[in-house]
Design a protein with these regions (language model features):
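Extracytoplasmic
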Residues: 31-33, 62, 75, 82-85, ...
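Hydrophobic/proline-rich hinge and linker segments of small-molecule sensing/allosteric domains
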Residues: 102-122, 211, 257
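Beta->alpha turn/N-cap motifs
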Residues: 69-73, 81-95, 165, 181-188, ...
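Short helix-loop capping/hinge motifs at secondary-structure junctions, enriched
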Residues: 118-125, 216, 261-264
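Secondary-structure end/capping motifs
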Residues: 224, 228-296
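N-terminal hydrophobic or amphipathic helices and topogenic motifs
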Residues: 1-66, 81, 98-100, 104-108, ...
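Pocket-lining segment of extracytoplasmic ligand-binding domains
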Residues: 142, 156-250
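Bilobed "Venus flytrap"/periplasmic-binding protein-like clamshell domains
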Residues: 31-59, 110-111, 115-174
Length: 376
């Protein structure tokens, strides 16, 4: 093989190696983009996730979020199951999925039930045979209403209502519903107080809170819920809403991830969620409510390994992560050096011929000298 062909072959190999290295570096340096299903767009969770997504970009995080709009937590979970999203904002009383693992507990909200005063409705059992107006995303409260009716043995009708004061007040004024049920974050207190006043004014009927007196027993039988209270004045207003504490149950909202997502990506995501919650709270106050998801084995959603690493403080340092490279790097460089020598020889580089001839001449002189000594 001529020297020109040898040089051409080596140049091609070097160019290929550089191209592969550049491609690998580009791929490794690009952030991981995770799709997250959340909605509706005008609800708090969508605003919070959007704010976090912008923060991840601004902070140069190795993980980014791409939002997949959904009609609510039920639809979001369905999208995760179908592979249309890698993350989803879901509720603890959803249908669940073996694919979903918890990243963080976003917030825990009280179940609020109200009914017009002087109608004899003081507890959920009084709603037997009556119509409940359910306010919220499509399908989000289906499991909740079904659980309550079964527990209190109070079958009846359900009517879905849009979360607008006009539609809600119209339903109350026309007696299309006997009570209202909704789940609302505590950070929406002022907004709820304003809506409450608007509904009361438009419907010309005073509303009262309905207590769930068997909340402890109900939560014990249904782990998706927790017993709790709506504290007096929790939703503001004048007079305070409510005027005294009301026993109820609470439902949790989680950020869950497909269990096949790498632990490193979820660890980075969890770190940002907690480190930046204060920065995001100005844009989305609900961000202040985020908590660590349960590490218990019987949790509604098992903890994702990546989130577990963050919560346990077991994130690896750069030395721990790249220690093997530092150990084996010199060996690899030595092997590359040996390979370079082979390439140089392949290209025709040899030891200097004059030097080689001189060494041969020295050996001949030594041999003649030795023969002369033997002859003597």
């Amino acid at each position: 093989m001529s020297r020109v062909l040898r040089w051409a072959l080596v140049v091609c190999c070097v160019c290929a190696a550089i191209a592969l290295g550049a491609a690998a570096w580009y791929r490794l340096s690009q952030p991981i983009v995770l799709t997250v299903a959340v909605g509706p767009a005008d609800f708090d969770d969508a605003a919070r996730i959007s704010a976090f997504a912008r923060k991840l970009v601004a902070g140069g995080s190795p993980v980014r979020l791409s939002i997949v709009p959904s009609s609510g937590p039920t639809d979001a979970l369905d999208r995760l199951k179908k592979g249309e999203a890698q993350l989803a904002v879901v509720r603890s009383d959803g249908s669940g999925s073996e694919q979903a693992q918890a990243v963080a507990l976003l917030h825990t909200d009280p179940v609020v039930i109200v009914a017009p005063e002087k109608t004899g409705i003081e507890s959920f059992g009084d709603l037997k045979g009556k119509t409940i107006g359910v306010v919220g995303p499509p399908g989000a409260n289906d499991s909740l209403v079904r659980t309550l009716r079964q527990h209190y043995r109070a079958p009846g009708e359900t009517k879905m209502l849009a979360a607008t004061p006009f539609e809600v007040s119209t339903a109350v004024r026309t007696r299309a519903v006997d009570a209202l049920l909704f789940v609302v974050p505590t950070t929406r207190g002022v907004k709820l107080g304003e809506s409450w006043a608007a509904v009361r004014s438009a419907s010309r009927r005073k509303l009262a809170f309905v207590s769930l007196d068997e909340a402890e027993a109900l939560a014990a039988a249904n782990p998706a819920y927790e017993a709790g209270e709506i504290e007096a004045g929790q939703f503001g207003g004048s007079p305070s809403l409510p005027e005294e504490s009301v026993t109820t149950i609470q439902v949790a909202t989680y950020l869950v991830a497909n269990r096949n997502i790498s632990a490193d990506a979820i660890t980075a995501l969890a770190r940002t969620l907690f480190q930046e919650r204060q920065a995001v709270s100005g844009e989305a106050p609900i961000a202040n409510l985020i908590k660590a998801a349960s590490t218990e084995k019987d949790a509604v959603y098992p903890l994702h390994p990546g989130a577990k690493v963050y919560y346990a403080g077991e994130e690896t340092s750069l030395m721990e992560r790249y220690g093997d490279w530092l150990f084996y790097g010199p060996m690899l460089l030595g092997a590359l050096g040996s390979g370079l020598l082979v390439v140089l020889r392949f290209l025709g580089f040899r030891e200097d011929r004059d030097q080689t001839a001189l060494l041969a001449r020295i050996r001949e002189v030594d041999l003649l000298d030795q023969r002369s000594s033997d002859a003597c």
